[in-house]
Regions:
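Short acidic/proline- and small/hydrophobic-mixed sequence motifs that coincide with surface turns
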Residues: 399-404, 494, 544, 611, ...
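Extracellular/secretory-pathway and virion-surface proteins
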Residues: 1-366, 372-376, 382-386, 397-400, ...
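Intrinsically disordered, low-complexity Pro/Gly/Ser/Thr-rich segments with frequent PxxP/GP/PP motifs
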Residues: 414-444
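Loop and turn regions of beta-sandwich accessory domains that flank beta-strands and are enriched
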Residues: 47, 53-54, 287-292, 297-323, ...
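Residue-level detector of functionally pivotal "anchor" positions at catalytic/ligand-binding pockets or at interdomain
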Residues: 359-384, 471-472, 477-484, 581-603, ...
């Protein structure tokens, strides 16, 4: 969330980690002086108890002059158990040095100032014992380019930390570490405890390599110096295991732009045999739900995107361990030689954990893992709202491969549908399922709840039903007129951007023809009642406008074809990879055609008196437009019969400055907008 001073301009790493006492102890050695002279630590201090003098050259006479030395206070530290507390003190004059005799500016002789004693430094070494704290990273995200974000901006990031139950107990510290230099962002953490039984019970969680930044490609100090083989004991009751990894590459320069913008693999060998290879990369930053950030948000990166999570990678180790025998793990990276050019040495932040478990708790356990659509959650906003086929993700959390299940789904309180899925999912594997369409009009209201659950896995009884069901809140799609137009302008990279208008069967009804650069196109759509999807795709993944290229600026908007070309929908030009816009024509996805799907805009607002009203209703009906002041008095009113859409002005120049309410009343409902007259 943004702090009161505003969010940071830059993308910075933010780590959420549990600081877990390890039960192991270490120490640090600190040297303390046996004495100090006027608070300073010196190797030795010759002294006498009678005043001494220091000679110096008098530049006016060219001869020697002198000044009496000040007393020096000696503090003596003789207690090794309390090395900073003085045990004695002394007042002495400095001695043991030469005074030089000057004649006419020239040194002609010297006199040694004898000392009667000398304090000789004898440092006391004190060992401070401490318990080693291990940092178990729960999750990592990168802050967005947030210059100009509203102070109310905030976003939730969810992490499943079930595997870390063995360390998330007793007393520990949870730290959120923001690596930026400005006020940056505020953050908080909430743990949700879900009652039930895990698919397999975690027994131990151990750090493989410490959580830190590992420089990459430095020939004089290669990453392999730190990622050395590590051996871990495996108890007889630890029958399963996995490796949990969160990698993210940072810094860039040179030909390869490593490690932030280069595609490199890491590997895990188990007992000397390579078992896992993983590309450290995200190729979907242009589909970031937090789009149009004022920075290079759309560039694909090394396992992260600005404003999103660094992905957690899990590797199933069970086939390669033997309970009761130790296992040796070794991580490595593709060879790379950094030759310079980056702001700082490239590298990877690595979190690596070994998780061991007991046996599987269920043989047959199908789970509903995600509802992608319909869903109002921000992370799914690129594909929502929808008016057609729901999308869910199912997961196998049983020991037996999942080959079939039934998915029951629909709007809560409405008509439910059932879909029979078949496939082959191993334990922990997922499948994205595009479900057949439902009866959207079986619910009331503009917002509702969608629910989906799995049942009948492998044609048998699910042994654990508490993870079968998920619910989501949803918003119904807008309803557009039967005829409207796509008004769009290409940029210089005209061959990158295309559009398609599809019906609910996936048939392409309209698409762009041959294009030219920096040209405005107006394509008119005539549609029958139904559900539709407009897809605008940019193969360069940089939309119709992006500050960091030379493609220029285009735009895309939906406009009315009846009357003046008022805007129905204005699309963000800095959209990255694609835009998906779902809508209906001729019917609303709720039971009644609610006015909340209408278009109702006032401009300018504030106004000096003349107000332009853009009003589009879902269907033709009688309408009353009225204006009310803050006292509840109607100061303007007009009626229109058989009205559906128009762009018109009303004159309120005779009204005093203040706040007003513009009301639209129809048999289907009421719309209200605030208006300020200056």
């Amino acid at each position: 969330i943004c702090p009161p001073t505003g969010c940071s301009d830059w993308d910075y790493t933010t780590e959420v980690k549990a600081r877990v006492p390890s039960g192991r102890f270490d120490s640090t050695a600190t040297q303390y002086p046996s004495f100090t002279a006027n608070g300073a630590t010196v190797d030795s201090f010759p002294y006498v108890y009678t005043p001494t003098w220091s000679y110096f050259l008098n530049v006016n006479t060219g001869n020697s002059d002198s000044i009496q030395n000040l007393l020096t206070r000696i503090y003596i530290f003789g207690d090794s158990l309390n090395p900073t507390v003085p045990t004695d003190s002394d007042f002495v004059f400095p001695a043991g040095y030469y005074n030089y005799i000057y004649t006419s500016g020239v040194v002609t002789d010297s006199i040694f100032v004898n000392y009667s004693g000398i304090y000789q430094q004898d440092f006391i070494t004190v060992y401070s014992v401490f318990e080693v704290i291990e940092d178990f990273e729960l999750g990592r995200m990168m802050t967005p380019y947030a210059n100009g974000f509203a102070l109310t901006w905030g976003r939730d990031y969810w992490y499943d930390v079930t595997d870390l139950i063995p360390v998330l107990k007793d007393t520990l510290t949870v730290r959120i570490l923001y690596s930026g230099y400005s006020d940056g962002f505020s953050a908080n953490i909430t743990f949700y405890f879900i009652e039930g039984t895990a698919p397999r019970t975690p027994i131990r969680a151990r750090i493989i390599y410490p959580l830190k930044y590992y420089e990459y490609g430095i020939t004089t100090n290669p990453i392999e110096n730190y990622l050395v083989p590590k051996t871990f004991p495996i108890d007889v009751n630890e029958t399963q295991a996995s490796i949990r990894v969160i990698p993210s590459g940072h810094s860039f320069g040179g030909a390869s732009n490593c490690a932030e913008f280069c595609q490199k693999n890491y590997r895990w060998s188990v007992d000397g045999v390579n078992r896992f290879t993983q590309l450290v990369w995200r190729n979907d930053c242009g589909l970031n739900p937090l789009w149009a950030q004022p920075g290079t948000w759309l560039y694909d990166r090394s396992n992260w995107c600005p404003g999103d999570k660094a992905l957690t990678r899990n590797h199933e180790l069970t086939p390669f361990i033997t309970p009761g025998n130790p296992v040796t793990l070794d991580m490595g990276f593709d060879a790379y030689n950094y030759t310079g050019g980056a702001g700082f040495n490239p590298g990877y932040i690595l979190s690596t954990q070994l998780i061991t478990y007991g046996p599987m708790n269920f043989q047959v356990n199908a789970a509903m893992d995600q509802i992608v659509a319909p869903n109002n959650e921000f992370e799914y906003s690129r594909v929502n709202p929808i008016c057609d086929k729901p999308i869910v993700v199912i997961k196998n959390l049983g020991a037996t491969p999942l080959t079939s299940c039934d998915i029951v789904y629909g709007i809560k309180g409405g008509t439910l549908a059932t879909y029979s899925w078949t496939g082959n999912l191993a334990f922990n594997a997922t499948a994205t399922v595009n479900l057949p369409s439902i009866t959207w009009g079986s619910s009331t209201g503009n917002q509702s709840r969608f629910e989906a659950w799995v049942t009948n896995p492998n044609n048998t009884v699910d042994q654990y039903t508490y993870d079968d069901t998920l619910r989501s809140s949803l918003t119904f799609t807008p309803m557009l007129p039967t005829q409207f137009a796509l008004l769009w302008k290409t940029n210089n990279a005209f061959n990158e951007t295309t559009y398609q208008l599809l019906n609910s069967s996936g048939t392409v009804l309209y698409s762009n023809g041959a294009l030219a650069g920096n040209t405005v196109y107006r394509d008119t759509f005539n549609l029958v009642p139904g559900c539709y999807t407009l897809k605008i795709v940019d193969s360069g993944k940089d939309g119709l406008s992006f500050f960091a290229n030379n493609d220029g600026t285009g735009y895309a908007r939906l406009v009315n074809t009846v009357g003046s070309a008022t805007i129905i929908k204005l699309f963000q030009a800095d959209f990255g990879t694609s835009i998906t816009y779902n809508f209906t024509v001729g019917f609303s996805t709720s039971l009644e055609e609610k006015l909340k799907s209408a278009v109702f805009n006032l401009s300018p607002n504030p106004t000096s008196g003349i107000v332009n009203i853009n009003l589009i209703l879902p269907k033709m009906e009688d309408v009353t437009i009225s204006v009310m002041n803050q006292l509840g008095q109607v100061v303007y009113s007009e009626k229109r019969s058989n009205f559906q859409q128009d762009l018109f002005d009303i004159n309120l120049e005779n009204q005093p400055a203040g706040m007003y309410f513009v009301n639209v009343n129809t048999p289907s409902g009421k719309l209200t907008e605030k208006l300020i007259i200056q």
